[in-house]
Design a protein with these regions (language model features):
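Cysteine-centered metal-binding/redox modules
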Residues: 1-233
Length: 233
């Protein structure tokens, strides 16, 4: 778990086209491209100590709920061309991780639904945010820190640390049907863990709505737990 280690790992492979981006890989949050997890980062550093995967000493805990550590902030600042001053690993709204352009999925806030949507690269349509994956990528990528939008690896969706500071998986209100089925088994385990065994079937897909208003109506009809959480904004 993130609590059981003192070291995270960085990945800066994508700085050639997103020079201010630093990926922070933890035991419970893999790289946003989906290709690197914490064990990969450790192994790559041992093989190539001067490579793009460097150890990040967590240091003093600043906010455990949001996933903010003094050592991580220092590392990210020094390795983002001094552009990114803070990093909160478990929040979409406060100092989220930057994104390059290689993300498997994009998380975006849906204020009317009091939750977030996720879309994968393969989905060709327009999402309830009013944007396609490509449109969202132009907002999210490039190394800028954009509260409300973040790129992720799809397996992060089922992590106990997924948006833990913002309400976790209970905030997930819309995703493409194909993506839902692809990660259903993993999501179900997390839903069971938090005592919401029916959650996965309450998450809307393009079959239930493609506008934020339609999604909000669907959530109300099925009693999605996001509607009972405090306002996201």
């Amino acid at each position: 778990t993130d609590e059981s280690v003192d070291v995270f790992y960085s990945c800066t492979v994508c700085q050639s086209y997103a020079p201010d981006h630093v990926c922070v890989i933890t035991p419970q949050r893999l790289g946003l491209c989906g290709a690197y997890n914490w064990l990969d980062g450790r192994a790559n550093y041992e093989i190539n100590p001067a490579g793009p995967n460097q150890p990040i000493m967590k240091g003093r805990t600043l906010d455990l709920d949001k996933g903010e550590w003094e050592g991580v902030n220092k590392f990210v600042y020094e390795n983002s061309n001094r552009k990114v001053e803070r990093f909160c690993g478990y929040s979409l709204l406060e100092a989220p991780m930057t994104s390059c352009g290689c993300f498997e999925c994009i998380i975006a806030i849906l204020p009317l639904a009091n939750g977030v949507m996720v879309v994968n690269r393969e989905f060709p349509g327009v999402t309830p945010s009013g944007m396609s994956f490509g449109d969202l990528a132009s907002v999210t990528g490039g190394g800028a820190q954009t509260p409300g939008f973040v790129g992720i690896g799809r397996l992060y969706l089922s992590s106990p640390k997924f948006l833990a500071a913002d309400g976790g998986i209970k905030r997930l209100v819309w995703m493409p049907k194909a993506l839902k089925e692809d990660v259903r088994e993993r999501l179900q385990k997390e839903a069971d863990r938090i005592g919401e065994p029916d959650l996965i079937d309450k998450i809307a897909t393009e079959e239930n709505g493609v506008s934020e208003e339609e999604v909000a109506e669907y959530l109300a009809s099925v009693g999605h737990p996001a509607l009972a959480l405090e306002s996201l904004i």
